[in-house]
């Protein structure tokens, strides 16, 4: 028999995520979370030891979602659209857990465990990008050496990781809405353009036009 999810625990995680995203994790205390939920701090501490415990549980969910987003196709050769889809899923995950990226350095300095787990995610992202790009080379979509693919994967991972922080310092774009994720995805995809064969570069341009409408 499957155990029922604990509603209070789920509410704490849901509300914490919303507050962290809106206000920034350093600006939210467990008392703030308890007040928002209209529960006592003692009730919150029954489910989570402290705020860092809440952050770790949210990170677990982020990590699982990110792992799913980075899965490469297994039963066929990769296509250009696969990278686009992967990036879309990754950017959606980044947006859903955006507090992790906004406060990334602070969080990783505070927790060695999170630092190690985030490093694993970056390693997994690099490997996934290399795998898909190598497949695109084999099918004639990309023209790039192994060294170029490694550098491309590094640049894609770096741009994706810090895209949200970059956007936040642009004065004209201080209000973020989910449809604007398309702009970030487009910028990352343009890193591929110099390595695409002519026909595939036109294909990328058509994909971009459809996506940014």
Language-model segments: which ranges?
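Helix-turn-helix
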Residues: 11, 19-53, 57
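Short, basic, alpha-helical segments at the C-terminal edge of helix-turn-helix-like DNA-binding modules
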Residues: 60-66
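Amphipathic alpha-helical segments used for helix-helix packing
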Residues: 94-116, 130-135
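N-terminal positioning helix adjacent to the helix-turn-helix/winged-helix DNA-binding module
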Residues: 8-15, 152
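Secondary-structure edge/capping motif, primarily at the C-terminal ends of alpha-helices
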Residues: 70-73, 101-108, 136, 140, ...
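C-terminal peripheral helix-coil segments that are non-catalytic and often amphipathic
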Residues: 165-213
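Hydrophobic alpha-helical connector segments
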Residues: 71-99
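Amphipathic alpha-helical packing segments from all-alpha helical-bundle domains
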Residues: 113-139, 150-165, 182-194
């Amino acid at each position: 028999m499957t155990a029922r999810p604990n509603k209070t625990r789920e509410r704490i995680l849901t509300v914490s995520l919303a507050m962290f995203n809106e206000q920034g994790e350093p600006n939210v205390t467990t008392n703030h979370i308890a007040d928002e939920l209209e529960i006592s701090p003692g009730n919150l501490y029954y489910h989570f030891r402290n705020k860092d415990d809440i952050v770790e549980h949210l990170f677990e969910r982020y990590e699982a979602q990110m792992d799913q987003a980075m899965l490469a196709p297994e039963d066929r050769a990769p296509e250009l659209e696969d990278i686009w889809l992967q990036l879309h899923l990754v950017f959606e995950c980044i947006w859903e857990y955006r507090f992790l990226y906004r406060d990334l350095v602070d969080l990783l300095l505070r927790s060695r465990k999170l630092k190690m787990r985030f490093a694993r995610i970056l390693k997994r992202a690099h490997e996934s990008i290399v795998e898909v790009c190598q497949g695109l080379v084999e099918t004639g979509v990309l023209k790039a050496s192994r060294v170029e693919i490694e550098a491309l994967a590094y640049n894609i991972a770096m741009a994706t990781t810090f895209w949200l922080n970059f956007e936040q310092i642009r004065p004209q774009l201080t209000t973020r809405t989910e449809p604007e994720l398309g702009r970030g995805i487009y910028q990352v995809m343009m890193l591929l353009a110099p390595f695409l064969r002519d026909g595939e570069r036109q294909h990328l341009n058509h994909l971009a036009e459809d996506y940014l409408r």
